[in-house]
Amino acid sequence: AMVPLFSRMGHFPYQVPTAVVSKTLDFGKFRIQDMTDYMRDTIKVWDELGFDPDCICTGFVLSEEQVELIGDYIRSRKPRMDEIQNVDNGRLVMVDPIMADGGKLYNGIGMERVAAMRKLVSYSDVMVPNMTEAGFLTGICPGRERASASELRELVDGLHKLSGKSVVITSAQDSETD
Protein backbone atom coordinates (compact mmCIF):
# COMPACT_ATOMS: atom_id res chain seq x y z
CA ALA A 1 0.00 0.00 0.00
CA MET A 2 2.95 2.34 0.56
CA VAL A 3 4.54 1.87 -2.88
CA PRO A 4 2.20 4.16 -4.86
CA LEU A 5 2.48 6.88 -2.22
CA PHE A 6 6.27 6.83 -2.14
CA SER A 7 6.48 6.54 -5.93
CA ARG A 8 4.30 9.63 -6.24
CA MET A 9 6.64 11.42 -3.83
CA GLY A 10 9.55 10.69 -6.19
CA HIS A 11 11.07 7.69 -4.42
CA PHE A 12 11.91 4.44 -6.22
CA PRO A 13 10.77 1.69 -3.85
CA TYR A 14 12.67 -1.59 -3.72
CA GLN A 15 10.46 -4.34 -2.37
CA VAL A 16 11.29 -7.53 -0.55
CA PRO A 17 8.53 -9.74 0.85
CA THR A 18 8.83 -10.92 4.43
CA ALA A 19 6.13 -13.57 4.04
CA VAL A 20 3.59 -14.89 1.60
CA VAL A 21 0.24 -15.29 3.35
CA SER A 22 -2.60 -17.42 1.96
CA LYS A 23 -5.35 -15.22 3.42
CA THR A 24 -5.64 -12.51 6.05
CA LEU A 25 -4.93 -13.79 9.53
CA ASP A 26 -8.42 -13.07 10.88
CA PHE A 27 -9.92 -16.28 9.47
CA GLY A 28 -7.99 -18.35 12.01
CA LYS A 29 -6.66 -20.78 9.43
CA PHE A 30 -3.95 -19.65 7.06
CA ARG A 31 -0.65 -20.65 5.54
CA ILE A 32 2.41 -18.42 5.83
CA GLN A 33 5.57 -18.94 3.80
CA ASP A 34 8.55 -17.49 5.65
CA MET A 35 10.70 -15.45 3.24
CA THR A 36 13.67 -14.78 5.55
CA ASP A 37 16.18 -16.63 3.35
CA TYR A 38 14.87 -14.77 0.30
CA MET A 39 15.20 -11.46 2.19
CA ARG A 40 18.80 -12.26 3.09
CA ASP A 41 19.64 -13.19 -0.53
CA THR A 42 17.88 -10.10 -1.89
CA ILE A 43 19.76 -7.76 0.45
CA LYS A 44 23.02 -9.38 -0.63
CA VAL A 45 22.14 -8.75 -4.30
CA TRP A 46 21.18 -5.14 -3.49
CA ASP A 47 24.55 -4.66 -1.81
CA GLU A 48 26.38 -6.18 -4.80
CA LEU A 49 24.49 -3.84 -7.13
CA GLY A 50 25.22 -0.83 -4.92
CA PHE A 51 21.58 0.05 -4.31
CA ASP A 52 21.36 3.05 -1.97
CA PRO A 53 17.76 3.55 -0.84
CA ASP A 54 16.55 7.00 0.06
CA CYS A 55 13.71 5.57 2.11
CA ILE A 56 13.17 2.29 3.98
CA CYS A 57 9.64 1.21 4.89
CA THR A 58 8.60 -1.89 6.76
CA GLY A 59 5.27 -3.60 7.16
CA PHE A 60 4.40 -7.14 8.25
CA VAL A 61 7.42 -8.79 9.85
CA LEU A 62 7.27 -12.49 10.62
CA SER A 63 9.97 -13.10 13.22
CA GLU A 64 12.71 -11.79 15.49
CA GLU A 65 15.20 -13.03 12.89
CA GLN A 66 13.60 -10.76 10.30
CA VAL A 67 13.68 -7.84 12.75
CA GLU A 68 17.42 -8.43 13.21
CA LEU A 69 17.97 -8.65 9.44
CA ILE A 70 15.99 -5.45 8.81
CA GLY A 71 17.70 -3.74 11.75
CA ASP A 72 21.15 -4.65 10.40
CA TYR A 73 20.17 -3.33 6.98
CA ILE A 74 18.88 -0.05 8.44
CA ARG A 75 21.94 0.41 10.66
CA SER A 76 24.27 -0.18 7.71
CA ARG A 77 22.60 2.62 5.76
CA LYS A 78 21.36 4.92 8.50
CA PRO A 79 24.56 6.94 9.04
CA ARG A 80 24.54 7.93 5.37
CA MET A 81 20.81 8.55 5.49
CA ASP A 82 21.12 10.76 8.59
CA GLU A 83 24.01 12.63 7.00
CA ILE A 84 21.95 13.66 3.98
CA GLN A 85 18.46 13.68 5.48
CA ASN A 86 16.50 16.85 5.02
CA VAL A 87 12.93 17.85 4.30
CA ASP A 88 13.53 18.03 0.55
CA ASN A 89 14.97 14.58 -0.11
CA GLY A 90 12.87 12.63 2.41
CA ARG A 91 15.49 10.04 3.35
CA LEU A 92 13.87 8.24 6.23
CA VAL A 93 12.90 4.96 7.88
CA MET A 94 9.16 4.37 8.26
CA VAL A 95 7.86 1.44 10.30
CA ASP A 96 4.27 0.21 10.21
CA PRO A 97 4.23 -2.43 12.98
CA ILE A 98 1.53 -4.59 11.43
CA MET A 99 0.49 -7.01 14.17
CA ALA A 100 -2.90 -6.07 15.66
CA ASP A 101 -6.22 -4.35 15.13
CA GLY A 102 -9.67 -4.21 16.64
CA GLY A 103 -8.29 -4.39 20.18
CA LYS A 104 -6.37 -7.66 19.73
CA LEU A 105 -3.26 -9.17 18.22
CA TYR A 106 -3.74 -10.92 14.89
CA ASN A 107 -4.14 -14.71 14.99
CA GLY A 108 -0.78 -16.40 15.35
CA ILE A 109 0.94 -13.30 16.76
CA GLY A 110 2.07 -13.33 20.38
CA MET A 111 3.83 -11.05 22.81
CA GLU A 112 7.25 -12.11 21.46
CA ARG A 113 6.32 -10.35 18.20
CA VAL A 114 5.30 -7.25 20.17
CA ALA A 115 8.77 -7.25 21.78
CA ALA A 116 10.38 -7.62 18.34
CA MET A 117 8.29 -4.73 17.00
CA ARG A 118 9.41 -2.53 19.89
CA LYS A 119 12.95 -3.12 18.68
CA LEU A 120 12.04 -2.43 15.04
CA VAL A 121 10.22 0.85 15.77
CA SER A 122 13.31 2.04 17.64
CA TYR A 123 14.98 2.41 14.21
CA SER A 124 12.15 4.49 12.76
CA ASP A 125 12.04 8.13 11.83
CA VAL A 126 8.28 7.76 11.42
CA MET A 127 6.15 5.02 12.95
CA VAL A 128 2.52 4.51 11.99
CA PRO A 129 0.87 2.07 14.39
CA ASN A 130 -2.88 1.85 14.63
CA MET A 131 -4.51 2.39 18.02
CA THR A 132 -4.35 -1.29 18.98
CA GLU A 133 -0.68 -1.62 17.97
CA ALA A 134 0.20 1.57 19.87
CA GLY A 135 -1.39 0.10 22.99
CA PHE A 136 0.53 -3.15 22.74
CA LEU A 137 3.83 -1.40 21.94
CA THR A 138 3.59 0.91 24.95
CA GLY A 139 1.56 -1.15 27.40
CA ILE A 140 -0.81 1.83 27.66
CA CYS A 141 -4.46 0.95 26.97
CA PRO A 142 -3.56 -2.41 25.36
CA GLY A 143 -6.52 -4.10 23.76
CA ARG A 144 -8.57 -0.92 23.54
CA GLU A 145 -9.79 0.79 20.40
CA ARG A 146 -10.77 4.03 22.11
CA ALA A 147 -8.96 6.27 24.58
CA SER A 148 -9.43 9.65 26.20
CA ALA A 149 -7.49 12.65 24.91
CA SER A 150 -5.09 12.38 27.87
CA GLU A 151 -4.59 8.64 27.23
CA LEU A 152 -3.90 9.37 23.56
CA ARG A 153 -1.26 11.92 24.59
CA GLU A 154 0.22 9.30 26.94
CA LEU A 155 0.28 6.79 24.06
CA VAL A 156 2.11 9.25 21.79
CA ASP A 157 4.60 10.03 24.58
CA GLY A 158 5.15 6.30 25.13
CA LEU A 159 5.78 5.75 21.43
CA HIS A 160 8.21 8.69 21.37
CA LYS A 161 10.18 6.94 24.11
CA LEU A 162 10.54 3.94 21.80
CA SER A 163 11.83 5.90 18.81
CA GLY A 164 12.17 9.54 19.81
CA LYS A 165 10.97 10.68 16.40
CA SER A 166 7.66 11.15 14.54
CA VAL A 167 4.56 9.18 15.48
CA VAL A 168 1.24 8.89 13.64
CA ILE A 169 -1.41 6.76 15.34
CA THR A 170 -4.00 5.64 12.81
CA SER A 171 -7.60 4.73 13.63
CA ALA A 172 -7.43 6.36 17.08
CA GLN A 173 -10.84 7.16 18.51
CA ASP A 174 -11.44 9.59 21.35
CA SER A 175 -13.54 7.79 23.99
CA GLU A 176 -14.93 11.12 25.22
CA THR A 177 -16.77 11.83 21.95
CA ASP A 178 -19.07 9.82 19.71
PLM regions with names:
Residues 107-178:
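Conserved phosphate/ATP/ADP-binding segment of small-molecule kinases
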